[in-house]
Amino acid sequence: MRYVMFICGDADHSADDAAAAPEIEDWFTYANERGQYVQGVRLQDLDQARTVRVRDGELLVTDGPYTEAREWIAGFGIIECDTFEEAVELARRNPMAWEGRIELRPIHSMGGPND
């Protein structure tokens, strides 16, 4: 099953946790050796974000995701694991679990060729 890892920055992380975090290169090696890494991207900073909504037929575009965000989506990864527990273990090894947080969600199959 595929899972999305929402990689979230967190302004409240501790310096000790960040210092103890594993290296990202080690995580990529670990995930790739097991065939669990599918793809991922790092997002540009919050000042490049726009929020788009349509309300009552009117387009509303605002700068940034939220005002004074303490947490933000910094990127995402797609992983493939046999169980949710395996996905949690893989996410635990990612340095962003130490420096921010990772939200895991199973990906709903849409029946496309890449599912």
What are these regions (language model features)?
Residues M1-D115:
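Conserved, structured core segments of small domains
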